[in-house]
Amino acid sequence: MDALRLANTALAVDIFKKLCEKSATDNFVCSPLCISSSLSLIRKGSQGNTASELEKALHFEKVKDPDFGFQLLSSDISKISSANSLKLLKRVYVDNSIECKKDFINSAKKPYPLELETIDFKSQAEEARTQINSSVKELTDGNFETVLNEGSCDENTKIIMLGAASFKGKWVYTFNKSETKEMDFHINKKETKPVQMMHLEARLSIGYINELKTMVLEMPFQSKHFSMLILLPKDIEDDSTGLKKLEQDMTFEKYTHWTNPSMMANSKVKVSLPKFKMENSYDLKDMLKSLGINDAFNEEASDFSEMTESKGISISQAIQKACIEVDEDGTESADVSMERRLMNKEEFLADHPFIYILRHNKTRTIIMLGRYCGPSEAS
């Protein structure tokens, strides 16, 4: 399980860095776990160089049994998801004309429950698209209206890899709504935009990355199954968001070190954090190709002989939608009234761009990650 956690973390950092490269100043949220789970299922059906490319991108070099690892992880997370308002949908849709081997179907059921689905793209592409959209809408409680746009499926569609992730958790400690006030958020050294800033004083885990002058705060959600980790540079020191150095320096090893509980201390913290809601859609094909997954997208080169006898099969589309909402809701008030309010307190003022990670604490798995650079026009 630990080897799989490390592999999933390494892919999550790769994905994060690709999203940062794409744009220096955009807000984003993404679920690397949806991607790694679906890719692992697709890897299970592949052979030869197709399998090698997938295993390399997934960092599976030291993972002895990824299927069993995903089985335990899915089971752990699904048990606590509904109580924590987490919706994770991972699907690999395969066209009916591709006859999947019985062994493949049966062996995928436990590690990737409900993730493999057959559907009729060949003769009813538009109906298939509508059916997929309805299914995603229903399974995410209406969070996502349209995942596949009109014309995105046709009679040549073979495999669609699709992920949808949404989260709106309740913190352990409630932010007092009456203390939420409009404040300036520094988008860069020169510009500000108004945000609704929430305030809280509580005992929380906090760490510091000295070489990057960056604070790491852990904010637990109810029942402490999930936490949000927030990486906040002390100040904006570059000509952009202030995150450039942190984004460039982040590696899988460094992230693991920075967020290790032994690197953090329990302290009284005065937190100021913007309220926000963020949603993104991704066509993942180019990103996955840039991570070295090429054959799986190329029907001339792909080898899915563990899945089917059919030839000329490739992934037609890889799509993800993700959304996250952060507000004051919590389950208990932080009782700091007994301690004098301003004694020896760390201040965590998130009034400039930061990186955030939604983590499953038992396995330290990254469920979602993102970057907040300021209020979007819509919010």
Swiss-Prot record:
One of its GO terms (cellular component) is extracellular space. The keyword Glycoprotein applies. It comes from the Eukaryota. Its main location: secreted. The keyword Secreted applies. Keywords: Glycoprotein, Secreted. It is found in: Secreted, Extracellular space. It holds the Pfam family Serpin. Disulfide bonds: none annotated. May not exhibit serine protease inhibitory activity. Belongs to the serpin family. Ov-serpin subfamily. This is Serpin B5.
